[in-house]
Protein backbone atom coordinates (compact mmCIF):
# COMPACT_ATOMS: atom_id res chain seq x y z
CA UNK A 1 0.00 0.00 0.00
CA UNK A 2 1.36 3.42 -0.89
CA UNK A 3 1.48 6.36 1.45
CA UNK A 4 -1.48 8.54 0.52
CA UNK A 5 -0.99 12.22 -0.12
CA UNK A 6 -4.00 14.43 -0.47
CA UNK A 7 -3.08 16.06 -3.79
CA UNK A 8 -2.48 13.07 -6.03
CA UNK A 9 -2.63 14.88 -9.29
CA UNK A 10 -0.85 18.07 -10.22
CA UNK A 11 -0.16 19.07 -13.81
CA UNK A 12 -1.16 15.59 -14.99
CA UNK A 13 1.49 13.76 -12.95
CA UNK A 14 1.09 11.19 -10.20
CA UNK A 15 2.63 12.55 -7.02
CA UNK A 16 2.60 9.83 -4.38
CA UNK A 17 5.29 8.41 -2.16
CA UNK A 18 6.22 4.79 -2.52
CA UNK A 19 6.27 2.60 0.58
CA UNK A 20 6.41 -1.19 0.59
CA UNK A 21 3.11 -2.80 1.59
CA UNK A 22 3.21 -4.06 5.16
CA UNK A 23 2.38 -7.58 4.03
CA UNK A 24 4.99 -7.65 1.26
CA UNK A 25 8.57 -8.71 1.93
CA UNK A 26 9.58 -10.09 -1.46
CA UNK A 27 11.24 -8.00 -4.10
CA UNK A 28 8.83 -6.70 -6.73
CA UNK A 29 8.96 -8.46 -10.11
CA UNK A 30 11.14 -6.88 -12.78
CA UNK A 31 8.79 -4.68 -14.88
CA UNK A 32 10.90 -5.31 -17.99
CA UNK A 33 9.80 -8.95 -17.93
CA UNK A 34 6.12 -8.04 -17.64
CA UNK A 35 3.88 -9.42 -20.39
CA UNK A 36 0.51 -7.69 -20.65
CA UNK A 37 -2.47 -9.09 -22.54
CA UNK A 38 -5.33 -7.53 -24.43
CA UNK A 39 -7.26 -7.47 -27.67
CA UNK A 40 -8.68 -4.09 -28.64
CA UNK A 41 -6.14 -2.37 -26.39
CA UNK A 42 -2.84 -3.68 -27.67
CA UNK A 43 -0.45 -4.63 -24.86
CA UNK A 44 2.46 -2.30 -24.16
CA UNK A 45 5.99 -3.21 -23.17
CA UNK A 46 7.48 -1.42 -20.20
CA UNK A 47 10.06 0.40 -22.32
CA UNK A 48 7.25 1.74 -24.55
CA UNK A 49 5.36 3.31 -21.66
CA UNK A 50 5.19 6.92 -20.57
CA UNK A 51 6.56 7.93 -17.18
CA UNK A 52 3.05 7.92 -15.68
CA UNK A 53 2.34 4.46 -17.09
CA UNK A 54 5.61 3.13 -15.67
CA UNK A 55 4.70 4.60 -12.28
CA UNK A 56 1.36 2.79 -12.33
CA UNK A 57 3.03 -0.50 -13.29
CA UNK A 58 5.65 -0.07 -10.56
CA UNK A 59 2.90 0.45 -7.98
CA UNK A 60 1.02 -2.64 -9.17
CA UNK A 61 4.11 -4.84 -9.04
CA UNK A 62 5.11 -3.58 -5.59
CA UNK A 63 1.60 -3.90 -4.16
CA UNK A 64 -0.55 -6.80 -3.06
CA UNK A 65 -1.24 -8.00 -6.61
CA UNK A 66 2.42 -8.21 -7.68
CA UNK A 67 1.20 -8.26 -11.26
CA UNK A 68 -0.82 -6.37 -13.85
CA UNK A 69 -3.22 -8.93 -15.30
CA UNK A 70 -6.88 -8.32 -15.97
CA UNK A 71 -8.17 -4.74 -16.30
CA UNK A 72 -4.84 -2.98 -16.00
CA UNK A 73 -3.95 -3.27 -19.68
CA UNK A 74 -6.98 -1.03 -20.22
CA UNK A 75 -6.63 1.28 -17.21
CA UNK A 76 -2.98 1.85 -18.13
CA UNK A 77 -4.16 4.04 -21.05
CA UNK A 78 -5.21 6.69 -18.52
CA UNK A 79 -2.58 5.99 -15.86
CA UNK A 80 -3.22 8.85 -13.45
CA UNK A 81 -6.79 7.75 -12.75
CA UNK A 82 -5.94 4.09 -13.36
CA UNK A 83 -3.39 4.21 -10.56
CA UNK A 84 -5.97 5.59 -8.12
CA UNK A 85 -8.60 3.09 -9.25
CA UNK A 86 -6.15 0.23 -8.68
CA UNK A 87 -5.48 1.44 -5.15
CA UNK A 88 -9.21 1.65 -4.41
CA UNK A 89 -9.63 -1.87 -5.74
CA UNK A 90 -6.71 -3.05 -3.62
CA UNK A 91 -8.31 -1.61 -0.50
CA UNK A 92 -11.60 -3.33 -1.29
CA UNK A 93 -10.08 -6.70 -2.15
CA UNK A 94 -7.07 -7.03 0.14
CA UNK A 95 -7.44 -4.60 3.04
CA UNK A 96 -11.04 -5.19 4.05
CA UNK A 97 -12.04 -6.89 7.28
CA UNK A 98 -14.56 -9.07 5.45
CA UNK A 99 -14.05 -12.86 5.48
CA UNK A 100 -12.28 -14.14 2.37
CA UNK A 101 -15.12 -16.44 1.35
CA UNK A 102 -17.50 -13.48 1.50
CA UNK A 103 -15.11 -11.33 -0.56
CA UNK A 104 -14.79 -13.94 -3.29
CA UNK A 105 -18.54 -14.63 -3.33
CA UNK A 106 -19.24 -10.94 -3.93
CA UNK A 107 -16.66 -10.87 -6.72
CA UNK A 108 -18.10 -13.86 -8.58
CA UNK A 109 -21.64 -12.50 -8.12
CA UNK A 110 -20.50 -9.28 -9.78
CA UNK A 111 -18.64 -11.12 -12.54
CA UNK A 112 -21.76 -13.19 -13.22
CA UNK A 113 -23.98 -10.10 -13.31
CA UNK A 114 -21.77 -8.43 -15.92
CA UNK A 115 -20.90 -11.75 -17.66
CA UNK A 116 -17.18 -11.03 -17.35
CA UNK A 117 -15.66 -14.35 -18.39
CA UNK A 118 -12.03 -13.72 -17.40
CA UNK A 119 -13.02 -12.25 -14.05
CA UNK A 120 -15.32 -15.19 -13.37
CA UNK A 121 -12.66 -17.74 -14.28
CA UNK A 122 -10.02 -16.13 -12.06
CA UNK A 123 -12.24 -15.67 -9.04
CA UNK A 124 -14.12 -18.92 -9.35
CA UNK A 125 -10.81 -20.58 -8.51
CA UNK A 126 -10.18 -18.11 -5.69
CA UNK A 127 -13.67 -18.68 -4.29
CA UNK A 128 -13.16 -22.43 -4.17
CA UNK A 129 -9.72 -22.01 -2.60
CA UNK A 130 -11.24 -19.79 0.10
CA UNK A 131 -13.90 -22.25 1.12
CA UNK A 132 -16.90 -21.38 -1.05
CA UNK A 133 -18.73 -24.63 -1.76
CA UNK A 134 -18.73 -25.81 -5.40
CA UNK A 135 -22.54 -25.99 -5.35
CA UNK A 136 -22.73 -22.31 -4.41
CA UNK A 137 -20.36 -21.33 -7.21
CA UNK A 138 -22.35 -23.40 -9.71
CA UNK A 139 -25.66 -21.85 -8.62
CA UNK A 140 -24.28 -18.34 -9.08
CA UNK A 141 -22.92 -19.29 -12.50
CA UNK A 142 -26.38 -20.40 -13.64
CA UNK A 143 -28.19 -17.39 -12.18
CA UNK A 144 -29.86 -19.30 -9.36
CA UNK A 145 -29.99 -18.52 -5.66
CA UNK A 146 -27.59 -20.88 -3.85
CA UNK A 147 -28.82 -23.11 -1.06
CA UNK A 148 -26.83 -24.11 1.99
CA UNK A 149 -25.06 -20.79 2.49
CA UNK A 150 -23.67 -20.03 5.93
CA UNK A 151 -25.60 -17.19 7.64
CA UNK A 152 -22.67 -14.76 7.41
CA UNK A 153 -22.39 -15.42 3.66
CA UNK A 154 -26.14 -15.29 3.04
CA UNK A 155 -26.26 -11.84 4.63
CA UNK A 156 -23.69 -10.57 2.13
CA UNK A 157 -25.32 -12.43 -0.77
CA UNK A 158 -28.67 -10.76 -0.04
CA UNK A 159 -27.15 -7.27 -0.02
CA UNK A 160 -25.33 -7.64 -3.34
CA UNK A 161 -28.18 -9.56 -4.96
CA UNK A 162 -30.70 -6.85 -4.07
CA UNK A 163 -28.38 -4.06 -5.13
CA UNK A 164 -27.52 -5.61 -8.49
CA UNK A 165 -31.03 -6.82 -9.32
CA UNK A 166 -33.16 -3.94 -7.98
CA UNK A 167 -30.53 -1.20 -7.63
CA UNK A 168 -31.84 -0.68 -4.10
CA UNK A 169 -31.50 -2.32 -0.68
CA UNK A 170 -34.39 -3.07 1.67
CA UNK A 171 -34.41 -1.93 5.29
CA UNK A 172 -34.27 -5.50 6.57
CA UNK A 173 -31.25 -6.42 4.47
CA UNK A 174 -29.36 -3.24 5.33
CA UNK A 175 -29.97 -3.74 9.05
CA UNK A 176 -28.87 -7.37 8.96
CA UNK A 177 -25.61 -6.54 7.18
CA UNK A 178 -24.90 -3.54 9.42
CA UNK A 179 -25.58 -5.53 12.59
CA UNK A 180 -23.20 -8.29 11.49
CA UNK A 181 -20.43 -6.38 9.71
CA UNK A 182 -20.85 -2.76 10.78
CA UNK A 183 -21.08 0.33 8.60
CA UNK A 184 -17.58 -0.21 7.26
CA UNK A 185 -18.59 -3.72 6.24
CA UNK A 186 -21.54 -2.34 4.26
CA UNK A 187 -19.27 0.17 2.51
CA UNK A 188 -16.69 -2.50 1.73
CA UNK A 189 -19.25 -4.92 0.27
CA UNK A 190 -20.79 -2.28 -1.99
CA UNK A 191 -17.40 -0.81 -2.89
CA UNK A 192 -16.03 -4.26 -3.72
CA UNK A 193 -18.92 -5.02 -6.07
CA UNK A 194 -18.62 -1.56 -7.60
CA UNK A 195 -14.89 -2.00 -8.21
CA UNK A 196 -15.45 -5.31 -9.94
CA UNK A 197 -18.15 -3.66 -12.04
CA UNK A 198 -15.43 -1.34 -13.35
CA UNK A 199 -13.13 -4.35 -13.78
CA UNK A 200 -15.85 -6.14 -15.76
CA UNK A 201 -16.41 -3.18 -18.04
CA UNK A 202 -12.67 -2.86 -18.72
CA UNK A 203 -12.30 -6.56 -19.49
CA UNK A 204 -15.39 -6.87 -21.66
CA UNK A 205 -14.76 -3.72 -23.68
CA UNK A 206 -11.20 -4.93 -24.32
CA UNK A 207 -12.44 -8.50 -25.05
CA UNK A 208 -9.69 -9.64 -22.71
CA UNK A 209 -8.53 -13.15 -23.64
CA UNK A 210 -9.14 -16.24 -21.55
CA UNK A 211 -6.12 -18.36 -20.55
CA UNK A 212 -5.04 -20.76 -23.34
CA UNK A 213 -7.27 -23.81 -23.55
CA UNK A 214 -9.83 -22.49 -21.06
CA UNK A 215 -13.34 -22.07 -22.53
CA UNK A 216 -15.73 -19.42 -21.16
CA UNK A 217 -17.84 -20.73 -18.28
CA UNK A 218 -20.74 -18.31 -18.26
CA UNK A 219 -23.76 -18.74 -20.49
CA UNK A 220 -26.08 -15.84 -21.30
CA UNK A 221 -28.93 -15.57 -18.81
CA UNK A 222 -32.46 -15.08 -20.09
CA UNK A 223 -33.11 -12.60 -17.32
CA UNK A 224 -30.00 -11.39 -15.52
CA UNK A 225 -32.12 -8.90 -13.56
CA UNK A 226 -35.02 -11.01 -12.30
CA UNK A 227 -36.76 -8.20 -10.44
CA UNK A 228 -36.62 -5.36 -12.94
CA UNK A 229 -35.81 -7.07 -16.21
CA UNK A 230 -33.17 -4.98 -17.90
CA UNK A 231 -34.55 -1.84 -16.35
CA UNK A 232 -33.39 0.77 -13.93
CA UNK A 233 -33.94 1.26 -10.23
CA UNK A 234 -37.09 0.32 -8.40
CA UNK A 235 -38.71 2.88 -6.09
CA UNK A 236 -36.76 3.54 -2.89
CA UNK A 237 -37.82 0.95 -0.28
CA UNK A 238 -38.93 1.93 3.22
CA UNK A 239 -39.52 5.24 4.92
CA UNK A 240 -36.75 7.77 4.36
CA UNK A 241 -35.34 9.50 7.46
CA UNK A 242 -32.72 11.91 6.14
CA UNK A 243 -30.43 13.76 8.51
CA UNK A 244 -28.03 16.65 8.12
CA UNK A 245 -25.18 17.59 10.43
CA UNK A 246 -23.14 20.77 10.37
CA UNK A 247 -19.73 20.59 11.98
CA UNK A 248 -16.28 22.10 11.78
CA UNK A 249 -12.80 20.80 11.04
CA UNK A 250 -10.66 23.45 12.66
CA UNK A 251 -11.85 26.80 11.36
CA UNK A 252 -13.63 25.32 8.34
CA UNK A 253 -17.28 24.34 8.55
CA UNK A 254 -18.73 21.43 6.61
CA UNK A 255 -22.05 19.65 6.16
CA UNK A 256 -22.73 15.92 5.92
CA UNK A 257 -26.03 14.40 4.85
CA UNK A 258 -27.34 10.86 4.85
CA UNK A 259 -30.13 8.51 5.79
CA UNK A 260 -29.11 4.99 6.80
CA UNK A 261 -25.54 6.16 7.36
CA UNK A 262 -26.22 8.81 9.98
CA UNK A 263 -23.95 11.81 9.47
CA UNK A 264 -21.03 12.16 11.85
CA UNK A 265 -19.85 15.31 13.57
CA UNK A 266 -16.13 15.94 13.59
CA UNK A 267 -15.93 15.06 17.29
CA UNK A 268 -17.54 11.66 16.63
CA UNK A 269 -14.91 10.66 14.09
CA UNK A 270 -11.89 8.44 14.57
CA UNK A 271 -8.46 10.00 13.95
CA UNK A 272 -8.38 8.35 10.50
CA UNK A 273 -11.83 9.73 9.64
CA UNK A 274 -10.79 13.19 10.82
CA UNK A 275 -7.72 13.05 8.60
CA UNK A 276 -9.85 12.12 5.60
CA UNK A 277 -12.33 14.89 6.43
CA UNK A 278 -9.57 17.49 6.79
CA UNK A 279 -8.41 16.66 3.26
CA UNK A 280 -11.95 16.81 1.86
CA UNK A 281 -12.77 20.12 3.54
CA UNK A 282 -9.59 21.66 2.12
CA UNK A 283 -10.46 20.47 -1.38
CA UNK A 284 -13.91 19.80 -2.90
CA UNK A 285 -15.97 19.35 0.24
CA UNK A 286 -18.00 16.65 1.96
CA UNK A 287 -21.02 16.38 -0.32
CA UNK A 288 -22.38 13.40 -2.20
CA UNK A 289 -21.20 10.02 -0.99
CA UNK A 290 -18.53 11.39 1.36
CA UNK A 291 -20.63 10.64 4.45
CA UNK A 292 -20.63 6.99 3.33
CA UNK A 293 -17.01 6.87 2.14
CA UNK A 294 -15.69 8.03 5.50
CA UNK A 295 -16.82 4.76 7.11
CA UNK A 296 -13.70 3.20 5.56
CA UNK A 297 -10.97 5.86 5.61
CA UNK A 298 -8.58 3.70 3.56
CA UNK A 299 -10.85 2.75 0.68
CA UNK A 300 -12.89 5.92 1.07
CA UNK A 301 -9.86 8.17 0.62
CA UNK A 302 -8.78 6.37 -2.53
CA UNK A 303 -12.33 6.65 -3.88
CA UNK A 304 -12.35 10.36 -3.05
CA UNK A 305 -9.07 10.90 -4.90
CA UNK A 306 -10.26 8.80 -7.83
CA UNK A 307 -13.39 10.96 -7.98
CA UNK A 308 -11.34 14.14 -7.96
CA UNK A 309 -9.45 12.89 -11.00
CA UNK A 310 -12.62 11.80 -12.79
CA UNK A 311 -14.45 15.01 -12.09
CA UNK A 312 -11.76 17.55 -12.87
CA UNK A 313 -8.89 16.00 -14.84
CA UNK A 314 -10.17 13.75 -17.63
CA UNK A 315 -9.17 14.12 -21.27
CA UNK A 316 -12.63 13.87 -22.82
CA UNK A 317 -14.74 17.00 -23.34
CA UNK A 318 -16.95 17.87 -20.36
CA UNK A 319 -20.09 17.44 -22.45
CA UNK A 320 -19.25 13.81 -23.22
CA UNK A 321 -18.13 13.07 -19.68
CA UNK A 322 -21.34 14.52 -18.22
CA UNK A 323 -23.40 12.55 -20.76
CA UNK A 324 -21.68 9.41 -19.49
CA UNK A 325 -22.41 10.36 -15.88
CA UNK A 326 -26.12 11.05 -16.34
CA UNK A 327 -26.56 7.84 -18.34
CA UNK A 328 -24.97 5.97 -15.43
CA UNK A 329 -27.12 7.78 -12.88
CA UNK A 330 -30.21 7.00 -14.98
CA UNK A 331 -29.30 3.31 -15.15
CA UNK A 332 -28.93 3.10 -11.37
CA UNK A 333 -31.83 5.42 -10.60
CA UNK A 334 -29.47 7.50 -8.45
CA UNK A 335 -31.56 10.60 -7.78
CA UNK A 336 -28.90 12.69 -6.04
CA UNK A 337 -26.32 11.94 -8.71
CA UNK A 338 -28.78 12.69 -11.47
CA UNK A 339 -29.77 16.07 -10.06
CA UNK A 340 -26.15 17.07 -9.44
CA UNK A 341 -25.04 16.23 -12.96
CA UNK A 342 -28.06 17.00 -15.11
CA UNK A 343 -27.31 20.69 -14.54
CA UNK A 344 -23.60 20.13 -15.20
CA UNK A 345 -24.51 18.34 -18.44
CA UNK A 346 -26.55 21.31 -19.65
CA UNK A 347 -23.81 23.74 -18.65
CA UNK A 348 -21.34 21.62 -20.63
CA UNK A 349 -23.46 21.89 -23.79
CA UNK A 350 -25.99 19.05 -23.70
CA UNK A 351 -29.45 20.41 -24.51
CA UNK A 352 -32.33 20.33 -22.02
CA UNK A 353 -34.39 18.28 -24.48
CA UNK A 354 -31.74 15.56 -24.61
CA UNK A 355 -31.39 15.47 -20.84
CA UNK A 356 -35.16 15.23 -20.45
CA UNK A 357 -35.32 12.36 -22.95
CA UNK A 358 -32.73 10.40 -20.98
CA UNK A 359 -34.62 11.03 -17.74
CA UNK A 360 -37.80 9.69 -19.34
CA UNK A 361 -36.12 6.64 -20.87
CA UNK A 362 -36.21 7.87 -24.47
CA UNK A 363 -33.39 8.01 -26.99
CA UNK A 364 -32.59 11.69 -27.54
CA UNK A 365 -33.18 13.03 -31.02
CA UNK A 366 -30.83 15.37 -32.82
CA UNK A 367 -27.64 14.16 -31.16
CA UNK A 368 -24.38 15.30 -32.69
CA UNK A 369 -21.97 12.66 -33.94
CA UNK A 370 -19.81 12.75 -30.81
CA UNK A 371 -22.84 12.61 -28.51
CA UNK A 372 -24.30 9.66 -30.39
CA UNK A 373 -21.02 7.73 -30.28
CA UNK A 374 -20.77 8.09 -26.50
CA UNK A 375 -24.49 7.47 -25.95
CA UNK A 376 -24.31 4.22 -27.93
CA UNK A 377 -21.16 3.10 -26.13
CA UNK A 378 -22.52 3.56 -22.60
CA UNK A 379 -26.07 2.34 -23.21
CA UNK A 380 -24.88 -0.69 -25.16
CA UNK A 381 -22.65 -1.65 -22.25
CA UNK A 382 -25.49 -1.42 -19.74
CA UNK A 383 -27.84 -3.37 -22.03
CA UNK A 384 -25.52 -6.08 -23.34
CA UNK A 385 -22.42 -5.98 -21.10
CA UNK A 386 -20.37 -5.63 -24.29
CA UNK A 387 -19.43 -3.11 -26.96
CA UNK A 388 -19.76 -4.13 -30.59
CA UNK A 389 -16.91 -3.54 -33.02
CA UNK A 390 -18.85 -0.74 -34.71
CA UNK A 391 -19.68 0.98 -31.42
CA UNK A 392 -16.13 0.66 -30.13
CA UNK A 393 -14.64 1.99 -33.37
CA UNK A 394 -17.04 4.95 -33.41
CA UNK A 395 -16.30 6.08 -29.87
CA UNK A 396 -12.55 5.52 -30.28
CA UNK A 397 -12.64 7.64 -33.43
CA UNK A 398 -14.24 10.47 -31.43
CA UNK A 399 -12.20 10.46 -28.21
CA UNK A 400 -9.16 8.27 -28.91
CA UNK A 401 -7.95 5.25 -26.99
CA UNK A 402 -7.26 7.16 -23.78
CA UNK A 403 -10.61 8.88 -24.08
CA UNK A 404 -12.39 5.53 -24.27
CA UNK A 405 -10.75 4.56 -20.99
CA UNK A 406 -11.69 7.89 -19.43
CA UNK A 407 -15.31 7.19 -20.36
CA UNK A 408 -15.08 3.67 -18.91
CA UNK A 409 -13.63 4.97 -15.65
CA UNK A 410 -16.16 7.81 -15.47
CA UNK A 411 -19.03 5.34 -15.82
CA UNK A 412 -17.35 2.93 -13.41
CA UNK A 413 -16.66 5.56 -10.76
CA UNK A 414 -20.16 7.01 -10.87
CA UNK A 415 -21.57 3.50 -10.82
CA UNK A 416 -19.76 2.91 -7.51
CA UNK A 417 -21.03 6.23 -6.18
CA UNK A 418 -24.59 5.46 -7.33
CA UNK A 419 -24.49 2.07 -5.62
CA UNK A 420 -23.32 3.65 -2.36
CA UNK A 421 -25.88 6.44 -2.52
CA UNK A 422 -28.73 4.05 -3.23
CA UNK A 423 -27.65 1.83 -0.34
CA UNK A 424 -27.76 4.86 1.94
CA UNK A 425 -30.92 6.26 0.30
CA UNK A 426 -29.04 9.55 0.16
CA UNK A 427 -31.67 12.31 0.10
CA UNK A 428 -31.77 14.89 -2.67
CA UNK A 429 -30.78 18.44 -1.85
CA UNK A 430 -32.92 20.88 0.09
CA UNK A 431 -35.73 22.18 -2.11
CA UNK A 432 -35.12 19.57 -4.80
CA UNK A 433 -37.52 16.88 -5.98
CA UNK A 434 -36.55 13.49 -7.44
CA UNK A 435 -36.81 13.49 -11.24
CA UNK A 436 -36.21 9.86 -12.18
CA UNK A 437 -39.17 7.52 -12.48
CA UNK A 438 -39.04 3.74 -12.47
CA UNK A 439 -38.33 2.32 -15.93
CA UNK A 440 -39.14 -1.26 -16.86
CA UNK A 441 -36.73 -1.33 -19.78
CA UNK A 442 -33.37 0.20 -20.65
CA UNK A 443 -32.73 3.27 -22.73
CA UNK A 444 -33.16 2.53 -26.45
Language-model region placement:
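Positively charged n-region of N-terminal signal peptides that target proteins for export
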Residues: 1-4
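Hydrophobic helical h-region of N-terminal Sec-dependent signal peptides
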Residues: 6-14
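Hydrophobic alpha-helical segments
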Residues: 18-444
Amino acid sequence: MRLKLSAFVLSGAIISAQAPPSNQTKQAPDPHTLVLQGDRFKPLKYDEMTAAQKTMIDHLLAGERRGANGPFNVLLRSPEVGDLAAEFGGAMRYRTGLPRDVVETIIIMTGRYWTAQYEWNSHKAAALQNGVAPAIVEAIATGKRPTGMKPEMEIAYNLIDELLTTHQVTDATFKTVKDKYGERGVFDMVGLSGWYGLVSMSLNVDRYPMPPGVPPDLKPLENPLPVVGMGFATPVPGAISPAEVKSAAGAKEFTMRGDRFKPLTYDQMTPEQKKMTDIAVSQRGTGGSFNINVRDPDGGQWLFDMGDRVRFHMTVPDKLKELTIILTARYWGAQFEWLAHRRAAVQAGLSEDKVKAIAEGRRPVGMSGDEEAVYNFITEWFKTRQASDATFAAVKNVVGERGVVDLIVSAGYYQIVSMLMNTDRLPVGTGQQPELKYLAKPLP
